[in-house]
């Protein structure tokens, strides 16, 4: 394994931990701090930098920048209408830098699945085991609060974990196809 790949995997592992923290903070306080989003953006840019150096192409970084800008411009009006929080807009805008432009479709599928699961839990809190979580979700339903950072973070964690798995499998493969050629 190359040093760039190892550094990229370390950055992605730290990003997964940070996404877990963002999800928990958003669930418990309905706040996503600027510091966490900025750190996530820096980790994503670092990972993209390593991948660009390894592939000798900056296309992935350009696609990610375009995706981040497009998501920000698409979600900003919803923030102005107070339909979504500013932290959710910032998190969605930083996510393409972490995921990479070529994996945004996979992230979108994960996001759809987790958003539907969140909707089901918020609308029917009896799906949860008894205790604090059920009480808290019932409170969120009464107030009309939905922590969108939780499904965004969960989808990003799944997408990044799948990328890490794929990178490790490719890096540790025996190269049998190359030997056949």
Model-derived features with residue positions:
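A membrane-topology feature that recognizes alpha-helical transmembrane segments
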Residues: 1-84, 89-181
């Amino acid at each position: 394994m190359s040093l760039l790949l190892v550094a990229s995997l370390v950055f992605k592992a730290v990003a997964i931990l940070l996404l877990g923290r963002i999800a928990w903070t958003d669930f418990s306080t309905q706040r996503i701090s600027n510091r966490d989003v900025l750190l996530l953006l820096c980790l994503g840019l670092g990972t993209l930098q390593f991948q660009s150096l390894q592939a000798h192409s900056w296309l992935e970084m350009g696609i990610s920048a375009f995706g981040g800008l497009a998501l920000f411009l698409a979600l900003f009006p919803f923030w102005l209408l107070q339909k979504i929080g500013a932290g959710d807009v910032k998190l969605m805008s930083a996510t393409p830098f972490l995921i990479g432009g070529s994996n945004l479709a996979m992230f979108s599928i994960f996001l759809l699945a987790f958003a539907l699961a969140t909707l089901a839990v918020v609308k029917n809190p009896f799906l949860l085991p008894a205790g604090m979580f059920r009480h808290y979700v019932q409170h969120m339903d009464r107030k009309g609060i939905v922590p969108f950072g939780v499904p965004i973070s969960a989808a990003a964690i799944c997408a990044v974990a799948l990328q890490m798995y794929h990178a490790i499998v490719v890096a540790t493969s025996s190269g049998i196809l190359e030997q056949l050629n």
